[in-house]
């Protein structure tokens, strides 16, 4: 699996917010591939096993993983071990309370029925959110999150790899533009089980 660049991460989705630059990029050698620590986002993750771990790996190395939260520490141990500097939590509310001022964005990959409330709490704090599907379980929850996004101005994305993956977009463009001719057969592979 190849690493995703910061540009691709912001474009395809996880979260978007430019940090305040303390030192000019030219001084830090940005043209040579170096990134100022102040240009990195501070990311927290809730639900870090399975898809949560996969989502964290998409930003590992390009962003700062500062806090991790999971109710099953036995299952989450491998991720905790991978990010020893990140603060560890059982309860996302405690993580938000203690780390809120230092978090730029949150990755949410918990049990489906908890997505909306964890997302709403993060958005209310002004945090950018990448949340796994399904984002909500009701029209009410969807409307609430839509209003929160509008009122807070945060960037949000729901993870739907089948529709939001950069490769999927590229192939669709090729087909729509007639660049590869008529498609008569498609073969797919999957990395299951990822959980």
Q: Could you tell me what each predicted segment is?
A:
Residues 111-112, 116-164, 178:
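Beta-strand-loop-alpha-helix segment that lines the small-molecule cofactor/substrate pocket
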Residues 95-101:
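Short amphipathic alpha-helix with an adjacent loop that forms part of the alpha/beta core around
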Residues 1-17:
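N-terminal secretory signal peptides and thylakoid transit peptides that target proteins
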Residues 87-91:
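Short acidic-hydrophobic, aromatic-tinged amphipathic segments that line or gate anion-handling sites
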Residues 65, 85, 103, 180-183:
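Local beta-strand N-terminus motif with an aromatic residue
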Residues 106-107:
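N-terminal Rossmann-like NAD(P) cofactor-binding module of classical short-chain dehydrogenase/reductase
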Residues 47, 51, 55, 152-158, ...:
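Predominantly a Rossmann-like dinucleotide-binding segment in NAD(P)-dependent oxidoreductases
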Residues 13-83, 162-165:
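N-terminal Rossmann-like dinucleotide-binding module
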């Amino acid at each position: 699996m190849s690493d995703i660049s910061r540009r691709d991460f912001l474009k395809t989705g996880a979260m978007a917010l430019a940090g305040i630059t303390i030192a000019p990029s030219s001084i830090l050698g940005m043209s040579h591939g170096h990134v100022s620590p102040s240009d990195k986002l501070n990311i927290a993750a809730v639900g870090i096993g399975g898809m949560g771990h996969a989502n964290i790996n998409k930003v590992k190395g390009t962003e700062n993983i500062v806090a991790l939260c999971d109710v099953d520490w036995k299952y989450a141990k491998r991720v905790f071990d991978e990010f020893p500097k990140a603060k560890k939590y059982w309860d996302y509310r405690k993580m938000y309370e203690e780390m809120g001022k230092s978090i730029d964005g949150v990755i949410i990959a918990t049990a489906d029925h908890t997505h909306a409330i964890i997302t709403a709490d993060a958005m209310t704090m002004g945090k950018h959110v990448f949340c796994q599907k399904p984002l909500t379980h009701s029209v009410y929850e969807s409307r609430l999150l839509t209003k929160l996004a509008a009122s807070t101005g945060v960037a949000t994305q729901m993870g739907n790899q089948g529709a939001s993956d950069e490769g999927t977009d590229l192939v669709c463009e090729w087909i729509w533009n007639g660049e590869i001719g008529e498609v008569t057969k498609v073969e797919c592979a999957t990395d299951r089980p990822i959980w």
